[in-house]
């Protein structure tokens, strides 16, 4: 079976790295994620990653607690840097060549984000991990995923979550919630579905960049998507 996508952008939430822990990075969880990524890389698909930082610090929560929102968001960007380094290290142990590019300069630790360099690294078969969101406060890492995906020419944004798609309501709170197989960006925005923020949806809609929402906890889901199988929910123009 041939690959459905040549280049994809994988959005990983920081919370997904916690596994069953309450905080931080669960090593077994990150190793399992890397095993899924290795399968996709082995198929020849070029993979970029945007990673969140909510397992360490959330800027929105900091702002709500009375901290200056911009300061809180910069702290959140630094949290994504920690996650990116952990993911890169796990990939190295799995034999995957990965590069971290940061929207905030931290030259002694990672490379700065340079679009042509990122594209070249993807073409060389390296995994490129984008850290520090967009580099600007008030923008989520979901928006960073939409932005970087558009910049590097990804064919789809793969949003890895703890649920297996987009639901009409929170399935944890509403047992009658139903899962969408497909949904348009406009409908997702008008229904205020919280799987991604409206800015990310709008950017992907304008760039005609589809989003597939799937469960990171479902074994083999990432590989099945790359092979073109129907997994999770497709958000489209």
Curated annotation (Swiss-Prot):
GO molecular function, one term: UMP kinase activity
InterPro entries found in the cross-reference section: AceGlu_kinase-like_sf, Asp/Glu/Uridylate_kinase, Uridylate_kinase, Uridylate_kinase_bac
Enzyme class: transferase
EC number: 2.7.4.22
Localization, UniProt: Cytoplasm
Annotated signal peptide: none
Regulation (activators, inhibitors): Inhibited by UTP.
Binding site for ATP: 11-14, 54, 58, 161, 167, 170
NCBIfam families: pyrH_bact
Protein name, entry field: Uridylate kinase
């Amino acid at each position: 079976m041939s690959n459905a996508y040549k280049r994809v952008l994988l959005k990983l939430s920081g919370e997904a790295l916690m596994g069953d822990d309450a905080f931080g990075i669960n090593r077994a969880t990150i190793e399992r994620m890397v095993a899924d990524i290795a399968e996709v890389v082995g198929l020849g698909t070029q993979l970029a990653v945007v990673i969140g930082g909510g397992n360490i610090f959330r800027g929105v929560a900091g702002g709500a607690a009375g901290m200056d929102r911009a300061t809180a968001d910069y702290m959140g960007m630094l949290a994504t840097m920690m996650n990116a380094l952990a993911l890169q290290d796990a990939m190295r142990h799995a034999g995957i060549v990965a590069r971290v590019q940061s929207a905030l300069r931290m030259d002694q630790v990672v490379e700065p984000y340079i679009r042509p360099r990122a594209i070249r690294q993807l073409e060389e078969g390296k995994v490129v991990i984008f850290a520090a969101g967009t580099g600007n406060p008030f923008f989520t890492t979901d928006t960073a995923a939409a932005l970087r995906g558009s910049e590097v020419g990804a064919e789809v944004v793969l949003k890895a979550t703890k649920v297996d798609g987009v639901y009409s309501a929170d399935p944890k709170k509403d047992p009658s919630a139903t899962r969408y197989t497909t949904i348009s960006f406009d409908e997702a925005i008008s229904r205020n579905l919280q799987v991604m923020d409206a800015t990310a949806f709008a950017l992907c809609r304008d760039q005609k960049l589809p989003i597939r929402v799937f469960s990171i906890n479902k074994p083999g889901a990432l590989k099945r998507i790359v092979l073109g199988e129907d997994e999770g929910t497709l958000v489209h123009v």
